[in-house]
Amino acid sequence: MRVAVAGCCHGELDKIYETLALAERRGSGPVDLLLCCGDFQAVRNEADLRCMAVPPKYRHMQTFYRYYSGEKKAPVLTIFIGGNHEASNHLQELPYGGWVAPNIYYLGLAGVVKYRGVRIGGISGIFKSHDYRKGHFECPPYNSSTIRSIYHVRNIEVYKLKQLKQPVHIFLSHDWPRNIYHYGNKKQLLKTKSFFRQEVENSTLGSPAASELLEHLQPAYWFSAHLHVKFAALMQHQATDKDQAGKETKFLALDKCLPHRDFLQVLEIEHDPSAPEYLEYDVEWLTVLRATDDLINVTGGLWNMPEDNGLHTRWDYSATEETMKEVMEKLNHDPKVPCNFTMTAACYDPSKPQTQVKLVHRINPQTTEFCAQLGITDINVMIQKAREEEHHQCGEYEQQGDPGTEESEEDRSEYNTDTSALSSINPDEIMLDEEEEEEEEEEEAVSAHSDMNTPSVEPASDQASDLSTSFSDIRNLPSSMFVSSDDASRSPASGEGKCGETVESGDEKDLAKFPLKRLSDEHEPEQRKKIKRRNQAIYAAVDDGDASAE
């Protein structure tokens, strides 16, 4: 089947589907499935904008709300994962995945589904070592800390995925697996993104958690985004059986949805012709969810996953034939994902913009139904109960704060390299911290009742026309799923045949009209930069430490 893969979407669904339609007309047939690698931005209304980790002036409504309201419908089944710039309150409603709009499916914090016999897995968010071993404790209203930590990958999601034994065909992650750049054209990558050089040479660019999953799952395809550059690699895994050759993983990262950027690629993927043409639950994955239900943690404390070290009575949560049969019985022997999308929040109305927004922690009926059918815990219900207990003990709700990130030597993450302190800056991005310092008077912790001047949410009609024209300039480029590396000893063969067609889009003049985002591998310095305040003379007597951003 023909599968389209998109990099960072940034809410530009109209442009992506328009580009896809043009690719279909110029290509060799209709596309069966669209996979999006994060920064999807399923923004329904102004409250959702408030929960997206970008500076206020870069918050734009974009076009998802039209698909949420039913005004438009996705022309092709769309599956996506979360990145580091999302409507976090919306996605939090669906920790196990679900429909965010008709024909648009979110994989959840981590998840695996099947479509036409193809097994598709993914993990949302990005890696940040000091949050990796925490539970999922965040909930709206977010503050300046939790609005970021909520999209950081947690060890429990990686642990669940590592229980899988059956082959995974396609896997999605937002940030790249660490070291994957050594298996592609590293020289060309550094020519395009020279500011990656230090991390590439030190092997610190990318996610060690994703790298661990790549080594364990060894999928046929791995797609990522996040770094805003197209890059392909071919990784040869070591054989586990002497009589069989090691598996190969074709890696492809794509750019963001902007004119003249390689943000979309169409591939031919083998599938099972006898498999149903609708989305199905993956029984092995559901079995793992049931087995690991007792491991759910909704606190900010650091904790380790069970392992075979003599300290745990159980460390193997993989599925067995018997436990998978139990899951099939709970599904009534029908693994079809129900089309049970329901609106849980008001949709943005351009004619009636809301200046007052209220951030609410919602329980989504899709998640309620899913958990009831499988007999597992709704994480959001668990979080709400924890807050109620806190309210009962303290007599009042307290402002949610960062529960502390200081660690002792023995409590450190198993990944001792934190990319947050790296100094390289992507000039294609905007540093969130810098912008927050610059907008010091405007920024405040996200609150349940907050005034908000909604940014311009729709382009002017002439701008929209220009953008439509620019995004229609598509060319089929030579495939880069197979590339020659500058490291000859580790390079994939360059003589492979064509595997896909790249879709690029057009006019460079509109680049400045799109919101930028920071690079988050994450390049947040541990000690934030000190800046000069706008009216420095007024603050001449203030201690120097007060002039730095908090």
UniProtKB/Swiss-Prot annotation:
Protein name: Lariat debranching enzyme
Record's compositionally biased regions (Polar residues): 416-426, 450-483
Residues involved in a divalent metal cation 2 binding: 39, 84, 174, 226
GO biological process: mRNA splicing, via spliceosome; RNA fragment catabolic process; RNA splicing, via transesterification reactions
Residues that bear N6-acetyllysine: 128
Protein family according to the UniProt entry: Belongs to the lariat debranching enzyme family.
EC number(s) recorded for this UniProt protein: 3.1.4.-
Region Disordered, annotated ranges: 390-550
